[in-house]
């Protein structure tokens, strides 16, 4: 029986080949901590031209109690993963600085619905941003 990571890697690999081309490989897949209403996974796509794309997968958490549709489970805010990813795309189209959404994953037996976007470096912990001197310029 395949692990959750193996199943997810398989689904990501197929979608990445469809999006980036034959020869694309998924490397360094790791689940990140945090995320109360969805999972966040970090990985790189090694693409056929020799480049590497740092990426993030945001997906619904697996659950035996919840049946999600192809676009995902609505969160407490009422937004499924497809809508969340699409909102990021639309925000980017009007000049809001957001990560680029590369592709969407539909729910299937290997994974829940989600989307893959550009991975950006930076701090994500609010406590650090609010208290550490290194982020003083970012605070009002």
Where do the PLM segments sit?
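Juxta-kinase regulatory segment immediately upstream of eukaryotic protein kinase catalytic domains
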Residues: 1-25, 29
